[in-house]
Amino acid sequence: MSYPADDYESEAAYDPYAYPGDYDMHTGDPKQDLAYERQYEQQTYQVIPEVIKNFIQYFHKTVSDLIDQKVYELQASRVSSDVIDQKVYEIQDIYENSWTKLTERFFKNTPWPEAEAIAPQVGNDAVFLILYKELYYRHIYAKVSGGPSLEQRFESYYNYCNLFNYILNADGPAPLELPNQWLWDIIDEFIYQFQSFSQYRCKTAKKSEGEMDFLRSNPKVWNVHSVLNVLHSLVDKSNINRQLEVYTSGGDPESVAGEYGRHSLYKMLGYFSLVGLLRLHSLLGDYYQAIKVLENIELNKKSMYSRVPECQVTTYYYVGFAYLMMRRYQDAIRVFANILLYIQRTKSMFQRTTYKYEMINKQNEQMHALLAIALTMYPMRIDESIHLQLREKYGDKMLRMQKGDPQVYEELFSYACPKFLSPVVPNYDNVHPNYHKEPFLQQLKVFSDEVQQQAQLSTIRSFLKLYTTMPVAKLAGFLDLTEQEFRIQLLVFKHKMKNLVWTSGISALDGEFQSASEVDFYIDKDMIHIADTKVARRYGDFFIRQIHKFEELNRTLKKMGQRP
């Protein structure tokens, strides 16, 4: 699906001051107006601690120095330099360490100073203020009790428009570089705030008439088309799909990067936008399109682009979930098992930063639940350490699911699925109380229908494992089914155990039909003939692989020892 560039421009060109001013926010109720004015005065004239002033000035100087250096590099037709890399590293330290520590100390549950309050200290630097506001509103969404007001949701949207406008509509590459972690967080937060607003606007019960009028008169703010257009524009500007295509075929991505894609800012925003599109299409329930946007990303191979752990985890979570909903259980199990093993081995790395740990830990728990569902519906062998974790966490629930308990399926699905949303602006004159739950209930129904179709398969599988031949009528009697009903269930078993499975190639949509079922059968007249297809584990191959790895490591160490 393509989105015209002029659509994006019309959305992105919003004037940040175009929304109603202070007077328009008055309600006519003296008590409410007085409370609003007190809050406004409190925000405008708050005293900024000296340490925060010094930090903001240092932050501004670091960003300004980087921009000045980037301007010089662009004029000299250079992509980057050691000076730029050093400045990006300094900004990363500010972003990941200083900002977090000061937030914890001064603004744990309250907002940072407004951009207007710090503007004089940074010389009203427009670019820095946009970046500052991005952090400011993100903090309000994450930590401030009560969350963002309607006005703050709109202001944050306009600020993102200004940021993407600066990056996408400049005459030539924008003179800016940011750490990969911050670039990922920008895309991640942009989609999160859209998701949050989509659910917020559907909950009309506690909204005043003024807020309802405000929502009615601004249907294009946080509109799904503007969000999609931003992501597609970043993908197109960076030429990231062509770069990935060349990279995966062993070529040099720089050769096809183009004027913008050569720069880290555009390249990484383009890559992260692909993951953003994966997430957005999954939230909208379009799983085929979700995986299709990643057709040039080889998931089963380490990449130079996968340097941000949260991006890796998010990618695998949404790809795995999309596979699950597309009934590609074997692929879903492979994806979940791979990323859970990765998290298991690198967990200590995330514990250094609390906010990263919380996010990754939550998705880790959700993926365990989804893996439990997938393995119940499609039993197959997985890594022993992951299987052990799964038995500890969900052993009891997996047994109940195997017995066909729909309540457990629903419970785990509700806990582990994404927060689905509707792209359509609701009819504010007639919104029923549970309107915001409709996208979730629709996806739950699709999933529950699939579970219902497979309700008998676990029992049939356990009976088939006991015999090699058996009259169809006799086995039907064991299951309290008529012969005709049993034959239908056997056909369902054959159909559901056959999956489209990825075997090779770059696109995650590629695959061939396979069955990983441990039993197979055929019917000859009135007799069912059963074969155990379970392959005994070949330990010899495992040890041979480990010996080869050890020998390769030994050779590498010897070469390192020979260096002067």
Swiss-Prot record:
Record HAMAP family: eIF3l (MF_03011)
GO annotation, biological process: formation of cytoplasmic translation initiation complex; translational initiation; viral translational termination-reinitiation
N6-acetyllysine, modified sites: K465, K549
Known function: Component of the eukaryotic translation initiation factor 3 (eIF-3) complex, which is required for several steps in the initiation of protein synthesis. The eIF-3 complex associates with the 40S ribosome and facilitates the recruitment of eIF-1, eIF-1A, eIF-2:GTP:methionyl-tRNAi and eIF-5 to form the 43S pre-initiation complex (43S PIC). The eIF-3 complex stimulates mRNA recruitment to the 43S PIC and scanning of the mRNA for AUG recognition.
Gene that this sequence comes from: Eif3l
GO molecular function: translation initiation factor activity
Protein's name according to its UniProt entry: Eukaryotic translation initiation factor 3 subunit L
Organism: Mus musculus (Mouse)
Family affiliation: Belongs to the eIF-3 subunit L family.
Subunit structure of this chain's protein: Component of the eukaryotic translation initiation factor 3 (eIF-3) complex, which is composed of 13 subunits: EIF3A, EIF3B, EIF3C, EIF3D, EIF3E, EIF3F, EIF3G, EIF3H, EIF3I, EIF3J, EIF3K, EIF3L and EIF3M. The eIF-3 complex appears to include 3 stable modules: module A is composed of EIF3A, EIF3B, EIF3G and EIF3I; module B is composed of EIF3F, EIF3H, and EIF3M; and module C is composed of EIF3C, EIF3D, EIF3E, EIF3K and EIF3L. EIF3C of module C binds EIF3B of module A and EIF3H of module B, thereby linking the three modules. EIF3J is a labile subunit that binds to the eIF-3 complex via EIF3B.
Recorded coiled-coil stretches: none
